[in-house]
Structures are given as structure tokens and as C-alpha cells.
Regions:
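Hydrophobic transmembrane alpha-helices and immediately adjacent juxtamembrane helices
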Residues: 17-27, 31-314
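Short alpha-helix boundary/capping segments
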Residues: 1-16
Length: 314
């Protein structure tokens, strides 16, 4: 049996991942094989079994996930004359503005760095990583609510949606990072082999973001104030992270407190790699990894316990 999203229902352009897409054709021809997704709703089942069932279901729907990522990317630039070229124009304009304003007009300088573009590079590095985190976390904490109609009409693993959020966030980040790398090459600040350290930093940032965003997203289904509260928290969180300012300008006590900010650890690690072109403090990143693991475990446990009730609240 072939299952299709109801095309007669109005669908918002940016939030409807499956508009016009055939669920069965995206699921590795699951329809032809007679397979279907059956969520485990038995709360008394062992949690390890339930986790394994969800992982297997997500793998079976990998084609659906890839198609949804592609669909979201296409919808973003639907009816645009320049289309996907805007993915280059926006970050290029951002980096150019930062470079010109802070390096030429304001002539901002970074302590311990003499280069004219040092502060611009410092700022861009922090903002790029922060944007990756905030985009994934913000979208993940509303993804179930935004896709409520889809979840009610089509039977598929709900956890596919957060994976789509991460995929789209990483694609956009990759485009911006490539342009930023070009800027670093032009200014002679492109790091060498040490740049490989950015890969685990980026991966850890995305992991922490989706773990936090999904945890908040589940809570947001039951308590809608969670999303609004998190948006406010992010504004304070940005300024509590050394992105616009270097941590060295803060009093010693403030620097000690910032060390407990996982985003500060990630941002400063990336800035160390890009500006100082040295390996980051892996021990500092290890505790961020520990936080991500614990937060992921909390999120999985919350989803297994409250997931079956989400359908009634959406």
C-alpha cells in the first residue's frame, strides 16, 4: 500500500518537509517489501530494546531523511531568481562587512595579535559556531509543533525530524565555512593541518545543540512556554560567550565562571585553532563531550517515557 501526504491540505513552504513527496518511495521501497513503521508504545518494554527499535526505524527511513533535507533546502529558495546563489551571497556579505567595518573603519585590534584582520577572524569564528548551535537548537525545540499536521497524517519515526534539522544546519554551516576559509586563505591566516581539529569541535557543537534542542522540543510539546523562555535565554547566553570580546579582558572571577559555559569552551577552542593555529585544549572539550552524552541520555529517556503522549498534545 502506498501512503502519500494529503496534497489538499495547505502546507507552509518552510515547515512542510514532505509536500508532494511519496513516503513509500523515500523509505527504500518499503511499500513494495510490505514493511511499515510501528512505534513501540509499550512503556514497560526494556528501554534498550526501545532504543534499538527507534534506531532501526530511523535507518530504514534514511532515504526519507535525505529527501527531506534536500526538500527543505529547495523550499528555502523557492521562487527566488538567484536560487541557491543566495547561500553564497549572505555569508559573503556578512564576512565582508565584518572585515571592512572592524579592520578598516573601526580598526579593532585583538590583544596579542597584530594582524589587521585578527579581530574580524576572531569574531567570524565565534559567530559561525554560535550560529550553528543556535540554528539547530532553536529549530529542534519547535520541530514537533511545526510538523504537527504531518505527524498526525503520516506514520513515520518522529526522530527523523530532528535529524533533518541537523542535516540542514550542517549544510548551511558548511557553505559559510567554505567561504570563510577562502577569506582566511586570502588574508594568509588559513591554518594548516591543525584545522582538522575543527571537525570534532563542529561535530560536538552540533551534538550538544541537537541534544539540548530535542530535550526542550519534547518539553515544549507539553509546556509551550519553554520555547519562548529558551529564546530569551539564548540572548543572554550569546553575551556570556566570548564571541564579541576575548575572555582575557574579563576579571579573573568572570573567566572562572565562563569556564562552566560549554559554548564558551567550544567557541574558544575554535578560535584557538583558527587564530593561534595550535591544537585546542582537549581536556576542556572532554567535559563538554560528557555534558552532551548525559544530555543525550536524558533526552532519550524523556522521549521514551513521554513520546507516546506527544501525539495527543500536538
Amino acid at each position: 500500500m502506498r501512503v502519500r501526504a494529503n496534497a489538499s491540505v495547505p502546507q507552509p513552504a518552510r515547515t512542510q518537509y514532505l509536500a508532494g513527496l511519496d513516503i513509500v518511495s523515500l523509505g527504500s521501497e518499503r511499500g513494495e517489501r510490505g514493511l511499515s513503521y510501528t512505534p513501540c508504545l509499550e512503556k514497560t518494554a526494556p528501554e534498550c530494546f526501545m532504543v534499538r527499535q527507534h534506531v532501526t526505524a530511523i535507518y530504514d527511513y534514511k532515504d526519507f531523511i535525505f529527501a527531506s533535507i534536500r526538500r527543505e533546502f529547495e523550499v528555502t529558495y523557492l521562487n527566488s531568481a538567484l536560487g541557491a546563489i543566495w547561500t553564497i551571497i549572505h555569508p559573503l556579505a556578512l564576512i565582508t562587512i565584518y572585515a571592512v567595518v572592524f579592520s578598516k573603519i573601526m580598526q579593532a585590534r585583538l590583544p596579542a595579535f597584530d594582524g589587521p584582520y585578527a579581530y574580524s577572524v576572531y569574531l567570524c569564528t565565534g559567530i559561525l559556531l554560535w550560529t550553528l548551535f543556535s540554528e539547530i537548537a532553536l529549530k529542534a525545540q519547535v520541530v514537533f509543533i511545526e510538523q504537527a499536521n504531518l505527524l498526525k497524517k503520516v506514520n513515520f519515526p518522529r526522530l527523523c525530524l530532528p535529524i533533518v534539522v541537523v542535516g540542514n544546519g550542517l549544510i548551511r554551516f558548511g557553505i559559510i565555512a567554505a567561504i570563510f576559509a577562502g577569506f582566511l586563505a586570502l588574508t594568509g591566516l588559513l591554518p594548516g593541518l591543525v584545522a582538522l581539529a575543527l571537525l570534532p569541535i563542529i561535530a560536538l557543537t552540533a551534538w550538544f545543540a541537537i541534544a539540548l534542542g530535542l530535550w526542550l522540543g519534547i518539553l515544549n510539546v507539553f509546556f509551550r512556554d519553554v520555547g519562548h523562555f529558551f529564546s530569551v535565554v539564548l540572548q543572554f547566553w550569546f553575551w556570556l560567550t566570548p564571541i564579541v570580546y576575548p575572555a582575557s579582558v574579563l576579571p579573573d572571577r568572570a573567566q572562572e565562571l565562563i569556564a562552566f559555559n560549554p559554548l564558551a569552551t567550544l567557541v574558544m577552542a575554535a578560535q584557538t585553532v583558527v587564530l593561534q593555529q595550535t591544537w585546542p585544549d582537549w581536556r576542556a572539550l572532554a567535559w563538554v563531550l560528557a555534558i552532551a552524552v548525559v544530555l543525550s541520555a536524558m533526552t532519550v529517556r524523556l522521549y521514551l517515557r513521554r513520546g507516546p503522549e506527544m501525539q495527543d498534545e500536538l
